[in-house]
């Protein structure tokens, strides 16, 4: 569900009139192809996942972990998230080409072939799992492999296309980096790790439902049964509010599990604003007024960033 759109490569980029023109064309094509492969990894999603990983590692360690371990997890986690996204693009190439939001991605524009995308995704997945297995531990590597397989084979290939609860069931994948980061440090999973996992898990519904509201017609055109596409406004509002409240409540459950006021106070404040924005959106939607769902979408990103920044700061103090 990346917001990234890509500019297609010109159909004449690789054609040549003469030897010199052909060489220049190929040289110009290389950056575009590299950019296309990078776009397949959905860098913005990778960035958001890493925002949750490092603070979880810091809390698990009780401070800043060894820099080499942080580097390994960041590289391995980035490759894993990128692999999952590339394979997602490969599986979803049929629906991406009919959605306005995604039709300029590399596969619909034929900038990258499906075969090459599949190979690229599998290579990234193999390297990421191997890296974590060699330099961290079996639990972190196993969680990474499980997250990739679940996201692509269970969520993308099956649940996304068949159930209105697709966002809920896919939420475990988005929250997995918290567990992976924690496991890389300790080799186990403590209650605090599961609490932070819960925050990210529940957060994804009030984060992604507004996106689906904005692109409702796009998802309908592709036949994807996102909740805002097929359910009533009342049902969508109820789920946004229930999961927004669960997100904030679980974030407070994490407070006594090794965190202090440096975490708790900012979390209370930003949580209150997050809930206010969720209620505003739902109130306007229920009245049939014009809504700006992306306001909650962006606010939810701010919320998660502040909460995990507070986790990191608390772990350092």
Curated annotation (Swiss-Prot):
A Pfam family recorded for this sequence: UbiA
Reaction(s) the record says it catalyses: heme b + (2E,6E)-farnesyl diphosphate + H2O = Fe(II)-heme o + diphosphate
Pathway recorded for this protein: Porphyrin-containing compound metabolism; heme O biosynthesis; heme O from protoheme: step 1/1
UniProt keyword annotation of Transmembrane helix present: yes
InterPro entries (UniProt xref): Protohaem_IX_farnesylTrfase, UbiA_prenyltransferase, UbiA_sf
Gene3D superfamilies tied to this protein: UbiA prenyltransferase
Keyword terms: Cell membrane, Heme biosynthesis, Membrane, Transferase, Transmembrane, Transmembrane helix
Gene Ontology biological process terms, A to Z: heme O biosynthetic process
Membrane topology type: Multi-pass membrane protein
Chief place where the protein resides: membrane
EC nos: 2.5.1.141
Cellular component terms per the entry's GO annotation: plasma membrane
Subcellular location(s) of the protein: Cell membrane
Region (Disordered): 1-21
Record-annotated membrane-spanning stretches: 45-65, 67-87, 116-136, 139-159, 182-202, 240-260, 262-282, 297-317
GO molecular function ontology, one term from the record: protoheme IX farnesyltransferase activity
Record-linked NCBIfam families: cyoE_ctaB (TIGR01473), PRK04375.1-2 (NF003349)
PANTHER family per record: 4-HYDROXYBENZOATE SOLANESYLTRANSFERASE (PTHR43448:SF7), PROTOHEME IX FARNESYLTRANSFERASE, MITOCHONDRIAL (PTHR43448)
Role, per record: Converts heme B (protoheme IX) to heme O by substitution of the vinyl group on carbon 2 of heme B porphyrin ring with a hydroxyethyl farnesyl side group.
Family: Belongs to the UbiA prenyltransferase family. Protoheme IX farnesyltransferase subfamily.
Additional information: Carbon 2 of the heme B porphyrin ring is defined according to the Fischer nomenclature.
Name of the protein described by the UniProt record: Protoheme IX farnesyltransferase
């Amino acid at each position: 569900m990346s917001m990234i759109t890509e500019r297609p490569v010109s159909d004449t980029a690789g054609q040549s009139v003469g030897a010199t023109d052909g060489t220049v064309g190929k040289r110009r094509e290389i950056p575009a192809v590299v950019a296309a492969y990078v776009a397949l990894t959905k860098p913005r999603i990778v960035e958001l996942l890493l925002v949750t990983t490092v603070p979880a590692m810091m809390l698990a360690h009780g401070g800043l972990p060894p820099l080499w371990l942080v580097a390994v997890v960041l590289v391995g986690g980035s490759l894993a998230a990128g692999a999952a996204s590339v394979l997602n693009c490969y599986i979803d190439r049929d629906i991406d080409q009919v959605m306005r939001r995604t039709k300029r991605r590399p596969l619909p524009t034929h900038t990258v072939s499906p075969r090459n995308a599949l190979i690229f995704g599998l290579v990234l997945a193999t390297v990421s799992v191997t890296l974590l297995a060699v330099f961290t531990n079996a639990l972190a590597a196993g969680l990474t492999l499980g997250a990739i397989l679940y996201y692509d084979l269970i969520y993308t290939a099956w649940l996304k296309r068949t159930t209105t609860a697709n966002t809920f069931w896919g939420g475990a994948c988005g929250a997995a980096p918290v567990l992976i980061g924690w496991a890389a440090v300790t080799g186990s999973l403590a209650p605090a790790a599961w609490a932070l996992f819960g925050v990210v898990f529940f957060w994804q519904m009030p984060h992604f439902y507004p996106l689906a509201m904005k692109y409702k017609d796009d998802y309908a055109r592709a036949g994807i049964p996102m909740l805002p596409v097929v359910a009533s406004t009342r049902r969508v509002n109820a789920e946004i509010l229930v999961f927004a409240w669960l997100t904030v409540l679980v974030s407070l459950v994490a407070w006594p599990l090794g965190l202090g006021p440096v975490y708790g106070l900012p979390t209370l404040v930003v949580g209150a604003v997050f809930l206010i924005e969720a209620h505003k959106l739902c109130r306007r939607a229920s009245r049939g007024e014009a809504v700006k769902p992306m306001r909650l979408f962006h606010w939810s990103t701010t919320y998660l960033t502040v909460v995990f920044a507070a986790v990191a700061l608390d772990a350092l103090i």
